[in-house]
């Protein structure tokens, strides 16, 4: 029996993508796979319906769990609050409970210096990341309070260390960290713990970049002290499973770097 059997986990940005070796090629899908192996029922949201459908098919067939998929695109033109409320309504109708919320979705324009950033580029990062986290957090709270659940949010070394060309992305991710610490403080009394992960994972985007531009990849992508870039399921998803488990309920409001030693900081 898996440790999350009978429980429900919501993961944003969890469409299916795989690497050339068949391993999970996106962080969200790696997390979904890790929880499916523990018997959790899953709610997966994202913009790309075909990737969500592919994830549902794969996870249900392999792990005998129930997967609810919902298209949700948080941007500066949609009624975002209504979209998130719809997600919560569907969770209540389908599963009747929510035990873990994982805000993973994020879009951004990378490599643009601050002086050249546009309002549109800033909005892309803020709405898909910070605003999405705010709305999901706000409307998941009643369900999480009932189960004394867990929240895991994703930030980045780009925000911690001010990476060049990551103005909008870093702003969104540091906003998410601040929002998460406030939630950890306010919701501790309800038995809800909230933590933040800063990951470094080998994704299908990185693999394609390496294949198409090997010289640029070598110059710009640095291997951490551990000697490899993290595995989305084994080294990111499995940590999410642990952080969301009862054994880690006392840990809240913390930023956890999963960067193989690259994110060393005081």
Residue ranges and their predicted role:
Residues 2-42:
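Canonical Rossmann dinucleotide-binding motif of NAD(H)/NADP(H)-dependent dehydrogenases/reductases
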Residues 20, 111, 161, 222-223, ...:
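Short C-terminal tail/terminal secondary-structure segment
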Residues 74, 214-234:
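Catalytic Tyr-x(3-8)-Lys segment
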Residues 87, 112-114, 118-123, 217-220:
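Substrate-binding pocket helix/loop in short-chain dehydrogenase/reductase
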Residues 99, 115-134, 152, 176:
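Catalytic Tyr-X3-Lys loop
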Residues 137, 172, 180:
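Active-site helix of classical SDR
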Residues 156:
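Residue(s) in the substrate-gating loop at a strand-loop-helix junction
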Residues 188, 193, 251-253:
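Short, small/polar-rich loop/turn modules that mediate ligand/substrate recognition or access, typified
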